[in-house]
Amino acid sequence: FTKSKLTVLEINPQVINIAKHFFRLPKESSRFKIIEGDGINYIASTDCKYDLFLSDAFEEYGLPETFCTLTYFESCKKILSDDGIFVINLWGSDPKTPIYINRIMDVFNQQVFYVQSDKPGNIIVFGFNYLLPSLKESAVKKKLKLLERKFNLKLMLYFNRLIKNSSIHPSDNALFNKE
């Protein structure tokens, strides 16, 4: 990712300081920019297009309601490139989470999947600004096994977790085709 550019938005200066001091947040550069300010205002006013937009906006008591509105999701879609991806971290125990997922599905024309952690907690939702391809499950597994050997990673373990804990199920999802 040597050509990647990263912009981070954070409204709380204390969070930025903690990240710098305890999480080795890199210094700003031509490829890495930190904006201290309101993310919603930034999204509404920017002309930039992003290939990937991550939203992780928790407060002391959970996700602020303004980051779960149809307007917010539409604004996020608007700043994506044609092949951009929106990712949001939701809280699984919030009774409104299914409503938020449905809003994201509406905004992204059903081109969405989500992954739940093994234990109740976070739900990561992916919204795609393009039509998802239809994949053959066996071809995906074959490629993952090759990559496992090449990189000494347990990719099949993660693939199986993804299938188990996500909205993607090869047997009934358009993302996967059985042979």
What are these regions (language model features)?
Residues 17, 64, 97, 135-138:
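Generic domain-boundary/flexible-linker signal
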